[in-house]
Amino acid sequence: MIQNQIKEQSLKVKMCGMRRKEDIAYANEVKPDAIGYIFFSKSKRYVTGQQARELDQNLDQKILSVGVFVNEIIEKVTEIANEVPLDVIQLHGDEDVIYIEQLRQQTDKEIWKAVRVKDTKDIKEAQQLPVDKLLLDTFTEEKDMYGGTGKIMNYDLIPKEGIRKPFFIAGGLHSKNIKEITEKVHPYGIDISSGIETDGCKDLKKMKEIMQITGGRHE
């Protein structure tokens, strides 16, 4: 058992970038609160709706399935959300209020919005969005880079008075820094991908380690 567990037992854990049967088997073993499928074709963790549906058939029903979309047309988002089916739609691109409101009219699924944080203004504006939860991620100038950078966000940008909406943090998280970061910013949850991989593939040992550190549901 890893020492110095995070005391806050309610910290949610989302493990993103599932694309192999082994990934789902690992998730079923360690039991994070949610897993993510990435439907952005430029991502190295990209899966199709059909692939996600086949993977999701073997996922423990207690684990939420989250679909990550980047500037996708709304009809395609709802099509995949119903096909898999997904529990949550996560928007990770440049989707604005109008887009989100239109999506709301076409689905009853929970909607999360990722925000690439460059300054405090980004967070303040994100709190006004009609979404259920936020995901604060690292800002990058790289073209077509929407998350998955493995780089740590500047957590000093999070307002000291807190954030009104429940929020996940992402970007460069791994077993060596999660405890310190979560104790500093007190997020609703963490979203981790590269931090549970070895050579680009999900690593069961690292997944177990994260769940132990966060006091998660791993048994």
Q: What kind of feature is each model-predicted range?
A:
Residues 1-219:
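Conserved N-terminal beta1-alpha1 strand-loop-helix module at the mouth
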